[in-house]
């Protein structure tokens, strides 16, 4: 019998949640995703030293202002890592907009255009790139504009049905609903464990997947942020799943049947009237878990972006 990773790939597009080239070569995913935390981690890999030096050299050529050089170097490093990943994966790389721009639509759009320009200048077409944006109201509005320009987006830090609905209504190419971080919140709140099938994160993604299929939204559902392989296997059949290295390794070394769990066959319904900003904010506010986890996720990515910039500043 084939290992579970091989079987899962027959049901779901498997994406590697890493910027580690050697690991990507090992597990052969279709796509790869990065975020500020993963870029920071990748920057510590000795083989990537040349990518950092190139980013710094480029930043110095763009501006005489030290603060701007730091920002430019961070953007170029994220793209440099993405370029290396694209030499390996046949599909797409997701590169994230600075989390500190999560509540600024215009700044998010400008940053996305800059990242796309850097990829384009390196010979990479838009259809191999996804721009990651936080699923705030402002991030979703930025995605709506970018999608119309041919810049496809990955809406991340998604913890609630309201966020998922708003993303679909905005025409986002893909969403990354988080599974493990939802589980973390419920375990801490209720002081109990959950089986994979009753895992609140799994239940959330399943509901979003079914809703999208029911209403014929083309937005891709890519489950993310897993804590164990049980969560992953309960979502077999999801459009895509982005998986970190430890769980990719565990799946590749485990045998046993993998069964499709997501496969909507119910009735189709007409799309509802799009949510207003007031409706979105109210529903997000009423979901304590999503409200807390969205804010926490943005803060965590901002901290790692700051650490990355501190490292780059020390080399400028």
UniProtKB/Swiss-Prot annotation:
The keyword Transferase applies. The active site is at residue 132. Keywords: Cytoplasm, Pentose shunt, Schiff base, Transferase. It is an enzyme of class 2 (transferase). It comes from the Bacteria. It is found in: Cytoplasm. One of its GO terms (cellular component) is cytosol. Disulfide bonds: none annotated. Signal peptide: none annotated. It holds the Pfam family TAL_FSA. Its main location: cytoplasm. One of its GO terms (molecular function) is transaldolase activity. Its EC number is 2.2.1.2. InterPro entries: Aldolase_TIM, TAL/FSA, Transaldolase_1, Transaldolase_AS. It catalyses: D-sedoheptulose 7-phosphate + D-glyceraldehyde 3-phosphate = D-erythrose 4-phosphate + beta-D-fructose 6-phosphate. GO terms for biological process: carbohydrate metabolic process; pentose-phosphate shunt. Pathway: Carbohydrate degradation; pentose phosphate pathway; D-glyceraldehyde 3-phosphate and beta-D-fructose 6-phosphate from D-ribose 5-phosphate and D-xylulose 5-phosphate (non-oxidative stage): step 2/3. SUPFAM superfamilies: Aldolase (SSF51569). NCBIfam families: PRK12346.1, talAB. Belongs to the transaldolase family. Type 1 subfamily. Transaldolase is important for the balance of metabolites in the pentose-phosphate pathway. Homodimer. This is Transaldolase. It comes from Aeromonas salmonicida (strain A449). The lineage of its organism: Bacteria, Pseudomonadati, Pseudomonadota, Gammaproteobacteria, Aeromonadales. The gene is tal.
